[in-house]
Amino acid sequence: MYSVNYHRASSVADAAKLMKSGDAKLLSGGMTLIPAMKTRLAAPSDLVDVSRIEALKGVKVSGKTVTIGAATTHFEVANDEKLKKACPALAHLASLIGDPAVRHRGTIGGSIANNDPAADYPAAMLALGATIVTNKREIAAEKFFKGLFETALKDGEIVTAVTFAAPAQAAYEKFRNPASRYAIVGVFVAKGKDGVRVAVTGAGDDGVFRAKPLEAALAKNFNASALDGVKVPASSMMSDIHASADYRAHLVTVMAKRAVSDAAG
């Protein structure tokens, strides 16, 4: 590690002000930033800690609308009773992230803002048609995730919450790396008033994406059997030491079938 100025923000407005200091970075759970700093892949002049801001914490459910504060930890998302009733699929997703240490420190806002191509939350946000709320505006998930580790966030913009309408049916299934527990392929399926959405993480060569062929099949028949013979093109899949593009394409359909079976269950 090296010399860095640490600031504990007292409010979102305070954090936005502190972010103007040199090359500042937001710190919440630190699950990505701190390892990056240790290996000198990131060298911010200032760290602005937002983990103690109460306005950024907690889960609220009002009717069918779910709102989750950006500093809410994975553990809190996984165990919130209101969320388990409104959208159990998202609570289940959070329970699959990392190990207990990661779940108690990592936050939903940090994961979304980082947009790791194998992270779980981006698939959920895309499938649920969520809105990403910042200190300056609201951004539809469809327009928020721009590619590998890229988002629509601008300098000084802070994710404060995510909000979405509770789906009628939803489920998440992932084939995970046994060491990191990141998704080699993760599929979130959600059925709501606007139809069926299927979002995939861990597989696409440009990050999280919607699997339109699977959505079209499920719109006609929301049953795992509707996906028999339906494939996504391997040409748009990433290939690495963990899985080939062809295998990832195969897993997308397999995980989608499992998710539909769970959701329809």
Model region roles, listed by residue range:
Residues 1-265:
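C-terminal structural segment of proteins
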